[in-house]
């Protein structure tokens, strides 16, 4: 199995998805002690280290002999929830991720972020680093609800292959998305615990009441009760607030497609942030499966055969 290192692992959504897809995680890193604790309670064949990426060295990472480096650099400086400001410091973590990848030079890498990173000043700098190092790149924005996750959550993926061809995975990732969005009831069944729930909107111009017969809106790092001043929105799933409640922390984890046996412990606010920051497990698995299929196809179809096939068509 391809060996994987996860930078910015959090509580393990991206790692678990890649493990589910058939990769072997050999090491993970994060600088949040509470997330590392949860990670290590759930993964037994490798460990996460409490370490800031600025303290990691190329030599240390290279010793793990990774075939793939994955990671989702913290995205608050790009996200609408964080009032995008690249001067805050988190945006440079994307460049640090690129610096480490380009130093270690694994055959492949996968970087995840919010789709707003496409409008950032940081992404072109990271892309230049990857291209200068010889990576071919696939850039896609995926809708999690079309990739097996009962949640509307658009995420950007930058996937690199050393000495490959640009857009090598784009068609497979985009074309395999489902036409129907995954609904909570379809994914979790009738035993979810509630038919209707409240998710605090960013502004009262947006609705806040949803049904499990639709995908959830994006699970964020905050979870608030229904305010007494809430006014019914035209798009709300019901006008009867007596039938509505906020989701519990574990219900939010299930919508993020963490399995029921994934262990969580700690304070509510920390867990809400941890779960909201995670890459949905099934979205990570979707990307991982397509990458692994591509890897296996490359092994079974040597480059010389591909070049000969192309020559024969001319």
Region spans (language model):
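Conserved SAM/SAH-binding beta-strand->alpha-helix loop
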Residues: 32-33
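S-adenosyl-L-methionine-dependent DNA methyltransferase catalytic core
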Residues: 2-25, 129-132, 155-314
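The conserved SAM/SAH-binding core of class I Rossmann-like methyltransferase domains
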Residues: 28-29
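Short, contiguous clusters of charged residues that form electrostatic/catalytic patches at enzyme active sites
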Residues: 51, 92-99, 124, 253, ...
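Conserved SAM-binding strand-loop segment of SAM-dependent methyltransferases
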Residues: 45-53
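Conserved SAM-binding loop
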Residues: 39
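Receiver (REC) domain switch-region micro-motif
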Residues: 4, 69, 109
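Class I S-adenosyl-L-methionine
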Residues: 56-66, 75-218, 222, 236
